[in-house]
């Protein structure tokens, strides 16, 4: 099967590798290199790097809907278009007559949008999964060809869930491409939206419930990441669970938990500014954190 693959993030890599092994990937379309890091040097997307490593045809348009790009894609005469975390909306001209499918990181119609993995943890879902849908002009609104479901771990972060969901993609995509392509329509009455995130979304208020705060910390880890100032140090919170013990909001209690509006937070893992990730116990021992110290949310 001749395939054009469109993707930019690491989420699509496992599926792309499988498609390259079992089918003919005629071209890979990805976002152009962007400046990143302290040196501000342009960096290719993970998908672009893989294309170069495998000597596959690579297209990196600023605008996928540019007529020249559309014409170039059509000239490939591919059988199928597979889209995973590409980052641009595709016009009907791009989709054309291809049998086109998209791998989305939720059980649609729940969590349409740019941040479904984060939303599933932050909102307290017990299960999630991936969906393979047809390409549609409305965001994530296509016909559902297949799904794969997993449970969300009690201490699982968005980064960890991302990797587990990405690993579900290859088998499901292959099943859809080689199967009978039966589908179901999405129920528009059940649609929920997971909009694109910003750093502001991860700002926390210690007056909130410990259950809510723990989900935010895990759901926004590793990015955009919740922060607290602890012993005068800006700390990125990576993993936490709620505790029923209560105290004065923001204070570190005798058991090491941080008192919040309802209950307390047990920080399991954090990353102080300028340091590597570490456990809460290692942080407290190294910084000589004292019971009764006050923590402040970083705005």
Each language-model region and where it sits:
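Conserved beta-strand termini and adjacent loop/short-helix elements that scaffold enzyme active sites
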Residues: 31, 61, 135, 147, ...
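Internal anion-binding site segments
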Residues: 188-299
């Amino acid at each position: 099967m001749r395939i054009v693959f469109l993707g930019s993030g690491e989420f699509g890599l496992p599926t792309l590798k499988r498609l390259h092994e079992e089918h003919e990937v005629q071209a890979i379309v990805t976002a152009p290199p962007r400046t990143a890091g302290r040196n501000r040097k342009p960096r290719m997307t993970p998908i672009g790097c893989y294309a170069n490593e495998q000597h596959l045809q690579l297209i990196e348009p600023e605008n996928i809907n540019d007529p020249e790009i559309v014409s170039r894609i059509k000239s490939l005469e591919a059988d199928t278009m597979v889209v995973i975390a590409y980052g641009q909306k595709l016009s009907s001209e791009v989709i054309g007559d291809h049998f086109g499918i998209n791998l989305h990181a939720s059980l649609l119609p729940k969590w349409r949008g740019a941040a479904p993995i984060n939303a599933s943890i932050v909102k307290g879902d017990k299960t999630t999964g991936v969906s393979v849908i047809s390409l549609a002009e409305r965001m994530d609104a296509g016909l559902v060809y297949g799904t794969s479901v997993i449970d969300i771990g009690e201490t699982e972060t968005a980064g960890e869930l991302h990797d587990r969901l990405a690993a579900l993609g290859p088998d499901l995509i292959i099943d859809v491409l080689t199967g009978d392509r039966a589908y179901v329509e999405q129920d528009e009455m059940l649609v929920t939206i997971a909009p694109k995130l910003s750093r502001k979304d991860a700002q926390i208020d210690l007056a909130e419930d410990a259950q809510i705060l723990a989900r935010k910390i895990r759901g926004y880890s590793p990015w955009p990441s919740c922060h607290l100032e602890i012993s005068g140090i800006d700390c990125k919170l990576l993993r936490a669970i709620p505790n029923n013990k209560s105290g004065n909001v923001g204070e570190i209690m005798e058991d090491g938990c941080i008192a919040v509006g309802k209950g307390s937070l047990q920080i399991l893992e954090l990353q102080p500014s300028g340091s590597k990730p570490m456990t809460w116990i290692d942080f407290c021992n190294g910084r000589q954190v004292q019971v009764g110290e006050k923590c402040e949310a970083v705005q």
